[in-house]
Amino acid sequence: CKKNKKAYNAGITTNGYNLTYEIFKKLKKLHVTEYQVTIDGLASIHNAQRVMADGAPTFDVIINNLLAIKNNCKSSAITFVLRTNFSKNMLNNVDEFCKFLDKYFSNDKRFKYFWQMVGDYGYVKTEEVRNIFGQSKDYKWLIENYTERFVNDYTQALYGPDGGVCYALKRNQLLIDAAGEIRKCTCDLESEMNHFGTIGVNFD
């Protein structure tokens, strides 16, 4: 891109657990400017929904990583989307969660919020998991009562007139997954049509 005088930037979706400030600085030098990190509510709920493989909690490590970046990086050219997947058992604690966000992140415009309901996207096998799914009425209630949290320039772009156009249609958009697979779409991961090769195998 530099040789051809083309602008380049990248974004990553990460659980944030290993996103230390030192790792962030290395990524920033590589023009990774957009990050999506999931925080599923306060510690008690997040640590029940998003645990390590060995069952260890993750909330404190992720929050401390985010705060280290927030407090030490002065660049305005980065964006953090804090995604929250609301399950039924979170709906009674939204106010408390908002107070937490206000305390640590709402004073920094680089941090945006993206709220979704937990749902079945085709991989759920047990009824126990289905019991935490929210309904469309729950999402409607969430948006109507917390509009000021939900609406920001990120969600406006996502749900605006152009937001419904799949970014896989863009000629200059590619996905590189954790295994080095090169794809266009971040959702249709099993389709061979969505697979262009592998770094180090088909591409240097």
Stretch-by-stretch model annotation:
Residues 1-41:
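Conserved SAM/AdoMet-binding glycine-rich loop
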Residues 16, 119-121, 188, 202:
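Short, solvent-exposed coil/turn elements at secondary-structure transition points
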Residues 17-19, 86, 118, 199:
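Hydrophobic pocket-lining residues within nucleotide cofactor-binding pockets
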Residues 20, 45, 201-204:
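Short, electropositive, low-hydrophobicity segments enriched in small/polar residues
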Residues 40, 44-179:
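Radical SAM enzyme [4Fe-4S]-AdoMet core and its adjacent flexible, acidic
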Residues 188-204:
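Membrane-interface junctions of multi-pass transporters
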